[in-house]
Amino acid sequence: MNTYYSIRFIYAGIFVLLILTLLMCALNAKRHYKALGQAVFWLDLAFIPPILGNAIIVVARNKMMALVGNYIYFVGMDFVVYELMKFTEAYCKGNRRERIAPAWVQYLLVADSLQLLINPITGHAFDIEWTVYQNQVFYVLKPLAGQAFHRIVDYGIFLLVFIGFSVATIRASRIYRERYSIILVAMGIVSAWETYYIISNSPIDRSMIGFGVLGVLVYYFAIHYRPLKLLDRMLSGIVSNGKDACFIFTPRGRCVWVNNAAGILVGVS
């Protein structure tokens, strides 16, 4: 296998696997009974267009194909930021008093997407140019004024989301703090990785791997995660060995912990 096929198809294959994984997570979240399922469904779907766009960019053999990939990528990032904002509002409900951002912020995202889509006519947002990377021709971004606006909008809204998630993490009870803090750290890592890609002007956006991982983490912690180990440590010295049966339920009615007496009572010990 020559260098062209090895580097391009390896990353394209990784991106395709991430897309399929995110699609599975999204569909499973939509079928789940939790209210968060809908928010997770849309967020995981939103991660797919940027990854798809970068897969197209990586394998592009001509400028037109690379341009198509870039448009999918940039408009997809607006979709990601919007759904990340909506997910944060749903996920952090109860630990925050206000919305993540005022309602008019979503119109900024619409305006940004529109100004990107008219770039073929105006040429104000970005262009691409070829470069040689590992002895192969790739296409890299040449940012213009519209691209600067795009980055200001997306990074600005992401900062609001990150601050809101940070506040929710601080306010969360010790039992559930882990489910907030891990996603918060993952968001920080992904944003730093994306920033490095922009600064380095690399022809391959490896931060898309982080986007895929973040989507899986969101699915797991929003839908399936239960703080069993911490609950067991906190409650073992209080009611684990008591004679009375003790059940611990979430606000949505899901049993997450029982002591020995309760286990014997329901036949699960």
Spell out what each predicted region is.
Residues 1-2, 130-148:
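Juxtamembrane membrane-water interface segments that cap and precede transmembrane helices
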Residues 118-133:
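Membrane-helix interface motif
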Residues 229-262:
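Sensory modules in modular signal-transduction proteins
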Residues 27-53, 71, 102-107, 143-199:
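Alpha-helical transmembrane segments of multi-pass integral membrane proteins
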Residues 3-21, 33-122, 148-155, 205-211:
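Individual alpha-helical transmembrane segments in multi-pass integral membrane proteins
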Residues 81-85, 162, 218:
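Transmembrane alpha-helical segments
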Residues 262-269:
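PAS/PAS-like sensory domain cap-loop motif
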Residues 2-4, 167-238:
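Interfacial "cap-and-anchor" motif at the non-cytosolic start of specific transmembrane alpha-helices
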